[in-house]
């Protein structure tokens, strides 16, 4: 059976739980709720669950380091469980994408997002499948303050369907051709 590492990016702790920067965690939580799983294992500064999905062994994970150190967790999980980079999918927030829009890519730069930037640097490749959840940006608020702020009530109505769609796209990508999944969800 093929193995997959699905990593949602965010910052640990209840004070960050509802922030824009934590939509990757929110997607992992949505998947766990949908599949009746819990993140009940911990290793390498991260929490995860292991399950069988679509004839594949899948690890759904949340690093418990801060966002900009996510790569350490990712490389340790890939190496320890012998998971190929081609079966890594990273889910994270994107300030350059409209709120509530999801975008799937097979490779590319970090776009300034520090979590994926750290993963790219540590893995020494930008050929990493990713699901970006649009959180927009506010020109009146400094970027670091904006991404660490909670969604406003009117934004939750927009972001919740994107989190669900991100979860569905993630599940669709397991054991499937990523190009087909991109065509369906982009």
From Swiss-Prot:
GO biological-process terms attached to the record: protein quality control for misfolded or incompletely synthesized proteins; rescue of stalled ribosome
Residues holding tRNA: 16, 66, 68, 114
InterPro entries on file: Pept_tRNA_hydro, Pept_tRNA_hydro_CS, Pept_tRNA_hydro_sf
GO molecular function annotation: peptidyl-tRNA hydrolase activity; tRNA binding
EC primary class: hydrolase
Entry annotation: catalytic residues: 21
Subcellular location: Cytoplasm
CDD domains given in the database record: PTH
One Gene Ontology cellular component: cytoplasm
EC number: 3.1.1.29
Pfam families: Pept_tRNA_hydro
Reaction equation(s) it catalyzes: an N-acyl-L-alpha-aminoacyl-tRNA + H2O = an N-acyl-L-amino acid + a tRNA + H(+)
Keywords: Cytoplasm, Hydrolase, RNA-binding, tRNA-binding
Main location: cytoplasm
Site (Discriminates between blocked and unblocked aminoacyl-tRNA): 11
Site positions (Stabilizes the basic form of H active site to accept a proton): 93
Assigned protein family: Belongs to the PTH family.
Subunit structure and binding partners: Monomer.
Functional note: Hydrolyzes ribosome-free peptidyl-tRNAs (with 1 or more amino acids incorporated), which drop off the ribosome during protein synthesis, or as a result of ribosome stalling. Catalyzes the release of premature peptidyl moieties from peptidyl-tRNA molecules trapped in stalled 50S ribosomal subunits, and thus maintains levels of free tRNAs and 50S ribosomes.
Name of the protein: Peptidyl-tRNA hydrolase
Gene this chain is encoded by: pth
